[in-house]
Amino acid sequence: MIYTQHYESPLGGILLAADDTGLTGLWFEGQKYFARTLDAVHQEQETAVLSEARRWLDVYFGGKEPDFTPPLHPAGSAFQQEVWALLRRIPCGQTTTYGALARQLAAERGLSRMSAQAVGGAVGHNVISIIIPCHRVVGTNGSLTGYAGGIDKKAALLRLEMKMTR
């Protein structure tokens, strides 16, 4: 069973989804790919996982870097899972590029190169926004490109994180 809850953030409404294992989704309401992995049958109900995710968001939007992570259980291909694991290693307050992620993943796989577009596709389909920090990935020239929640939210998240790490 999938359980959901709504969370009101300073940047707008967020839908949280979880199963008994961990958080399965975190989407800004109305974002691209909104709740695309959410089962048709789900129940709005408080669970320990959702409570932990809400606590994480309270700390984060309160201007502090959370020192814990709720259990995560995102559905995705093996490739997406690899990319999302890389995203989790980008430190708060820092950014990286799609190309740098592609080079890092290629090196970890023992390959000479990897497509930045393929990595970008996996980043763009991240189902747990903010906690899996896809907003920390920028274009080669540092431009704020592509964020399913919208560029305005990406910029606001990066500004918030810069304040956290000062």
Segments predicted by a language model, with ranges:
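Nucleic acid-binding interface residues in structured DNA/RNA-binding domains
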Residues: 3-10, 64-166
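DNA-contacting interfaces and partner/effector-binding or oligomerization modules
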Residues: 1-24
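Compact structured core domains
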Residues: 18-69
